[in-house]
Amino acid sequence: MEYLERRYLSASELQAVIDVELPNYWTGINRNAFVFCALTGLSHSDVAKLTHADIHTDGNGNRWIIDKRQKTGTQFRVKLLPIAEMIYDRYKDLHLVGNRVFPLKGTHKTLNMSLRHVARHAGLSFNPTIHLARHTFATTVTLTQGVPLETVSKMLGHKHITTTQIYAKITNDKIRQDMAALSEKLDSVFKVAQ
């Protein structure tokens, strides 16, 4: 099976999107939804339907999204990372219709148009889509940081790990890091006879 090459944001590109000052309130909301998706792996349809009831707090005070994928009905769970938690806290008291978390307007096409403005202000050389946030989660936020593919697959709500392999790219930097760690481990295991 041949996999399509998927795009994702690098860590520095994601940071530029997080940091950028935006002139428009709604563009800011759309940027925040994009960043939230990049840090949780949610798709547009999942973030659009996300309610406060989908956010659960465990015994240690950690907040988790526990829900079912809109597309497949597969359950997923993902912990809110600190920036995602800050974004959630920004909108939790808005009292939106249906107890929704984000005040998103329009379709994914409308959101993608807004993300073009975000990209321009953030200095990106391409126009990201909301779906690119999911690929960024799989690649930059999780796999590159050492999260196992099986765990990423469960957090994305994939039924088959082969689907996750399409989303996730192992970067050359990650290969270098892993090989350096392996070399260090093996140096104490194997010795060349003199």
Where are these regions (language model features)?
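Basic, Lys/Arg- and aromatic-enriched nucleic-acid-binding interface segment
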Residues: 1-44, 48, 145
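C-terminal catalytic core of Y-nucleophile DNA break-rejoin enzymes
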Residues: 2-4, 70-89, 97-117
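Catalytic-site neighborhood detector that most strongly recognizes the C-terminal catalytic loop/helix
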Residues: 8, 69-73, 156-181
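Conserved tyrosine-mediated DNA breakage-rejoining catalytic core shared by Y-recombinases
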Residues: 13-18, 40, 49-89
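Extended hydrophobic-aromatic, low-complexity segments
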Residues: 26-27, 45-48, 57-60, 75-78, ...
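Short basic/aromatic active-site micro-motif
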Residues: 29-33, 105-108, 125-145
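C-terminal catalytic core of tyrosine-transesterase DNA break-rejoin enzymes
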Residues: 35, 39, 45-46, 117, ...
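C-terminal secondary-structure termini that scaffold catalytic or DNA-interacting sites
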Residues: 182-194
